[in-house]
Amino acid sequence: MSMGLLLMAILTLSCLSSSIFRQQDYALAQQYIQTIKYRNLVIDLGNGIKTNAQLTIPAIGKGPFPGVLIISGSGAQDKDGTVGPVHKNGPEPLTPYLQIARYLSERGFAVLRYDKRGIGANLTIDHKIWGNSTINDLINDAKKAIAVLALQPEVDPTRISIIGHSQGTIIAPRVAIDNSTEVKNIVLMGIVASSIRDLIYLQRVSLPLEYVEKVLDKNHTGLISIQQISKNSMLRLLLIPSSIALTFLRTNDTNVIKDGLEKIFANKTNVAGYISIEHQIKPLLIKRYENLSSFSSSKCNMVEYCSVYYRALFSLLPNLSIIGNISKSTGILLLNGENDSLTPVEQAFLLQQKLTEVNHPDHVLITYPNLGHLFYSSSRWMTTYGPIQQYVLADIYSWLEAHSGLSESFFKPTNAFTNTANTSSLNTNKTS
């Protein structure tokens, strides 16, 4: 009897084990089911300059699918929006634009992403091209990309939308204004509304100083140590020269930061190695900002831009001055994290107010509590690296779905504060 029970137990365990392994194999196989297709393209930007691009489309169906162009944020950005240190031994960097493209293409959209001029994968830079780039070049590049997207056989040229993030929120409205018959909708994420000069001062002087005084100087001594600065991801890149910043991004060696700071503040620390916030940190932050805004820098920061770029950027009319020129038939979705330290949520409120003032009939603002510039949980002081939250992606898709003819459903955001225009095509109920 006991032997029979033992055999039954063994057989039962064997069946259970087999079932578990089958479930695991099925789950593993599910991960490799192809839901989207990729096609690499080359965009001719003119004057002998070309850049790589990639189109993602649903794996099933011939289309034509509604098209989406993603316009990236500031700095040296490849088509994936690669964020974070890029080096052999470090963690995988984030790729937020690839994340958006995959999400939308799995659900029925053809999405085009492209490298900025002079930029290749993993922050490889053609210094001659990148160092002479201006915001006007980037606007024209986006127009070229829209034309390429519209020509793809899988894309319906009558249903094209643009997603712009950060700096892309400066470019996208201008492309929409100049291509009003092609661009049906724009999605602006991490919004720039007012003067670029004022926004950069906030980013590089006002907010860092407030952070140092309220967070790092816990004892209210007016002092901070070099060790504290070298460990702080926001402060260290604002205070050190761009050459040191670039070396750090390539090596992820914090000693590079510490050594650079010690040279900057040589003979300016007290016995304990502390420096004055008011007399050392503040003047250096202002000096870095003035060097940038005066266009007097003789050396380019290849991670960001050169003076030729900032000169053109600062002369650009703010979005508040041009947003009223967008066609009334163009749908506008505004998205902003409430803890965004680079493009504060107040920027989004201003743009929404302006759209209301000019009686734009189809716009909606969604703000997300606790999310930062990358639409990931962040403090109000600095951007935390992480993937875009799924409910943000769901909001983008739902709105585009309702505005691209994929469904007749009304748009209802998931997990945010919503402020909508009076329009029959949107759900006007506020959620929180």
Show which residues each predicted segment covers.
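Alpha/beta-hydrolase active-site loop
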Residues: 131-152
